[in-house]
């Protein structure tokens, strides 16, 4: 057993040979390397599978033994300072390693088909291999310097993968935005690490925890300074895990290939921030103000992410805001001190969200044959619909992932989210109300995505759509850039959304709705049926087995992974697999809890949370189910006519919610106006001072000297005797002036 742990340090480096060899091969032997592309893919999957098996073995052993910490290499700078390189194996490391490798393997298998026609196929796999290596190095790190090194590598890999299609200006801007935003967080993290070293004199996790506990017990620490260091440490996870207000990079990161979106949102980039907060929780937990800040940032992100997802038309962007909201739940749990619930939700959400992203990639892949390869078309849910009969396997998998994220039992996210909601009730009633309300919003926007994508008919053939930019209704009045130029900002949302080519009418009109097969009215969209012509229509088809296989495996994970946190026996609440791994786990909310499971309380709380989820699903179903398929929706809409007195108020509310969501809460606009433009203005002023004033003074002295020399040259008549005469005259005058000044002092 000890022999096995001695080689744990090699975990991050097992997948590393493939990206290194690919990089060298593409530079020196590009043709031969490209001809062996399938072999490189197999090697990537094989090496990551070895890491997965190793991680599984370590996880099993973690149930029976304590944490393992060992330094492998040391760089001594002087007698008082040295850098250590080692590994720290504990249940958190084991769980994260399994999560990274399982999702990573499935994404690699998926990418083999998804990226097969891309010219950057091998470059993509090189980046992916390096990404997995960086994340594995991060979770096995034994000290903060090592963490920061791999933390930066994770950010670099995300920059490369988000901007993988760097020839597209949108993708290039997206990767720059992600890079710059994370620089802010990384700078704060670096300052926090240096401040913590100033206090404790060590970077090692175990030494940090022990030294700091002693300082606290002896009251030998400046509490304000440590609070500042703790906050700076938390700034890094705020940016990396897309927490408010440094979340702005996450939706733009969807410009990268779909497989990398799945990996970033499930097991790598955004999970890194949650991991670091969990790793440093023994430090944060002794500072109530930092714990409250963590929970506050988490609850704000929970609500903000859910509201921003309400009006997205891009399927990947909607899922991105969903990730942001779910990460907020995890951060909220960590801020409440519910360590186990946060990590449980990290696990269940990772597999559910990977399933949803790979499912969306399958949909996008099938839609590209119909609408083309532009993401503005292939990812646009407005052009989808009616895919149930065309992609039944993908539809079933996507539905399971959607239900899981909504918190429907017995799927994975139900168990973890229910724990967080229950803990929020113990922590703060206000936080509990927000968390529970957001659970309903989650169900609403997730089923909105599902219904727009799979229900009804294929909207591509029902839209007045052309591949060229036009002023047709395909701009949908609220979606296209072209329409934004001519949009009257005073328009109400509801009248605008239900307008057709000849007139504009309100969603809540005075006369009863009539059955019409030519118009489908939905909140936020209107789709016109212009009739079928004689041309042949093509429809999406199910993806290949290489794409479906990872989706089906993730489907199984989504169905059964929640079992690791369920106490199946009656011995106590800490007798499930997850609790055995995290024993003794940090949980401030259940220190005095009973040693048995109160199933009545569990069922009561579960019924409440599931009821909220079903209410959100019901609202989404009423608003987004195809109207022409049933008369029930018309009856529902006609009942709204009785609300004439509330019509204007209701329209204003919908208009506000839509504008808030579609414009990203105006946060991007705020940053652009008051931060980016201010920095650019300051840069312009600095440039003016540097070139006009600083350079002007220097150049002025030089020009003045030049003209004085020119004048002197003509006065001397180009004779040495004249130059000597003038020189001696000037020296004499200078000495006389100096003498008189000196004489006056006496």
Swiss-Prot record:
Its EC number is 7.1.1.-. It is a multi-pass membrane protein. It comes from the Eukaryota. It is found in: Plastid, Chloroplast thylakoid membrane. GO terms for molecular function: NADH dehydrogenase (ubiquinone) activity; quinone binding. GO terms for biological process: ATP synthesis coupled electron transport; electron transport coupled proton transport. It is an enzyme of class 7 (translocase). GO terms for cellular component: chloroplast thylakoid membrane. NDH shuttles electrons from NAD(P)H:plastoquinone, via FMN and iron-sulfur (Fe-S) centers, to quinones in the photosynthetic chain and possibly in a chloroplast respiratory chain. The immediate electron acceptor for the enzyme in this species is believed to be plastoquinone. Couples the redox reaction to proton translocation, and thus conserves the redox energy in a proton gradient. PANTHER family: NADH-UBIQUINONE OXIDOREDUCTASE CHAIN 5. NDH is composed of at least 16 different subunits, 5 of which are encoded in the nucleus. This is NAD(P)H-quinone oxidoreductase subunit 5, chloroplastic.
């Amino acid at each position: 057993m000890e022999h096995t742990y001695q080689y744990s340090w090699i975990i991050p480096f097992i997948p590393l040979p493939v990206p290194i060899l690919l990089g060298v091969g593409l530079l020196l032997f590009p043709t031969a390397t490209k001809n062996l592309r399938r072999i490189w893919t197999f090697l990537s999957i094989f090496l990551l599978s070895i890491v997965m098996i190793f991680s599984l073995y370590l996880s099993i052993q973690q149930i029976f033994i304590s944490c393992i910490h060992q330094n492998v290499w040391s760089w001594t700078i002087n007698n008082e300072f040295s850098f250590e390189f080692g590994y720290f194996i504990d249940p958190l490391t084991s769980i994260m390693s399994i999560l990274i490798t399982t999702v990573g393997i499935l994404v690699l298998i998926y990418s083999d088909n998804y990226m097969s026609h891309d010219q950057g196929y091998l470059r993509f796999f090189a980046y992916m291999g390096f990404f997995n290596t960086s994340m594995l190095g991060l979770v096995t790190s034994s000290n903060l310097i090592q963490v920061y090194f791999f933390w930066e590598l994770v950010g670099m890999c995300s920059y490369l993968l988000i901007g993988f299609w760097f020839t597209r200006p949108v993708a290039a801007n997206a990767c720059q935005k992600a890079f710059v935003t994370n620089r802010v967080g990384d700078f704060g993290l670096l300052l926090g690490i240096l401040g913590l070293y100033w206090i404790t004199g060590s970077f090692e996790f175990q030494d940090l925890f022990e030294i700091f506990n002693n300082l606290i017990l002896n009251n030998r620490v400046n509490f304000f300074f440590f609070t500042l260091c703790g906050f700076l440490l938390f700034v890094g996870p705020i940016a990396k895990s897309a927490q408010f207000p440094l979340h702005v990079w996450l939706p733009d990161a969807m410009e990268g290939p779909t497989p990398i979106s799945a990996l970033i949102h499930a097991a790598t980039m955004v999970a890194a921030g949650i991991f670091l907060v969990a790793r440093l929780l023994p430090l944060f937990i002794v500072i109530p103000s930092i714990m409250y800040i963590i929970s506050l940032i988490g609850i704000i992100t929970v609500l903000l992410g859910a509201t921003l997802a309400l009006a997205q038309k891009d399927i990947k962007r909607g899922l991105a805001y969903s990730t942001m909201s779910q990460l907020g739940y995890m951060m909220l749990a960590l801020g409440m001190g519910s360590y186990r619930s946060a990590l449980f939700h990290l696990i269940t959400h990772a597999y559910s969200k990977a399933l949803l992203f790979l499912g969306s990639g399958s949909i996008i892949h099938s839609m590209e044959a119909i609408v083309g390869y532009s993401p503005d078309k292939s990812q646009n849910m407005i052009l989808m619909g009616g895919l149930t009969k065309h992609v039944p396997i993908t539809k079933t998998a996507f539905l399971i992932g959607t239900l899981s994220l909504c918190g429907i039992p017995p799927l994975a996210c139900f168990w973890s989210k229910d724990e967080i909601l229950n803990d929020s009730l113990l922590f703060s009633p206000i936080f509990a109300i927000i968390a529970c309300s957001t659970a309903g919003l989650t169900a609403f926007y997730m089923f909105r995505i599902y219904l727009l994508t799979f229900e009804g008919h294929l909207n591509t053939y029902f839209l007045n759509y052309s591949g060229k930019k036009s002023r047709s209704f395909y701009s949908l009045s609220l979606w296209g850039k072209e329409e934004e130029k001519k949009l009257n900002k005073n328009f109400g949302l509801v009248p605008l959304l239900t307008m057709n080519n000849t007139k504009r009418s309100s969603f809540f009109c005075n006369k009863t709705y009539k059955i019409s097969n030519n118009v489908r009215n939905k909140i936020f969209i209107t789709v016109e049926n212009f009739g079928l012509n004689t041309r042949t229509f093509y429809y999406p088809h199910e993806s290949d087995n290489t794409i479906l296989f990872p989706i089906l495996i993730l489907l199984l994970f989504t169905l059964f992974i929640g079992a690791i946190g369920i106490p199946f026996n009656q011995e106590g609440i800490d007798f499930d697999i997850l609790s055995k791994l995290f024993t003794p786990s940090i949980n401030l909310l259940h220190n005095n809890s009973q040693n048995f499971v109160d199933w009545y309380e569990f069922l009561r709380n579960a019924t409440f949370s599931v009821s909220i989820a079903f209410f959100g699903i019901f609202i989404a179903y009423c608003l987004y189910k195809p109207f022409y398929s049933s008369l029930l929706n018309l009856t529902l809409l006609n009942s709204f006519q009785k609300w004439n007195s509330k019509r204007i108020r209701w329209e204003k509310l919908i208009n506000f919610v839509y504008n808030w969501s579609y414009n990203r809460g105006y946060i991007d606009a705020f940053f652009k106006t008051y931060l980016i433009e201010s920095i650019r203005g300051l840069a312009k002023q600095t440039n003016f001072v540097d070139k006009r004033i600083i350079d002007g003074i220097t150049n002025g002295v030089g020009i003045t000297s030049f003209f004085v020399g020119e004048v002197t040259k003509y006065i001397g008549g180009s004779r040495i005797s004249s130059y000597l005469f003038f020189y001696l005259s000037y020296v004499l005058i200078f000495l006389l002036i100096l003498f008189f000044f000196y004489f006056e002092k006496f």
